[in-house]
Amino acid sequence: MCDDHAMQAISAYGSPISKLAPTPNLDRLAAEGMLFRQAFVENSLSTPSRACLMTGLYSHQNGQRQLAEGIDSTKTFFSELLQGAGYSTAVVGKWHMSCSPKGFDYYHVLDDQGQYYNPTFASTGQYGNFKQEMGY
């Protein structure tokens, strides 16, 4: 799942710029399933949009109306429902919410906007809680 991916960046939609970075796996999913031509988000900012995806709630209900506010971590996350149904769950990338990722078997996330050169990730697994990556 991607919370901040422009339609024109996916080859299946036919945008000329999609040739810069082809998306064959997403294109296959679109060919075998469905292509959304009228999809909308509840909030166009990355963190509030992510909070809406994670909770299924509007921003005013989940507490993450702006970048600087914090999500109400007592709300049930979609990842917790997936775990409860027996799925393995993981999240990798920018988390940027005020709570630790919950409902994930594995995570490797940037806590905040952070620095993108030699970033420090919050992680589960062999590296413990934090691991610094080298480079971009």
Residue ranges and their predicted role:
Residues 1-136:
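Formylglycine-dependent sulfatase
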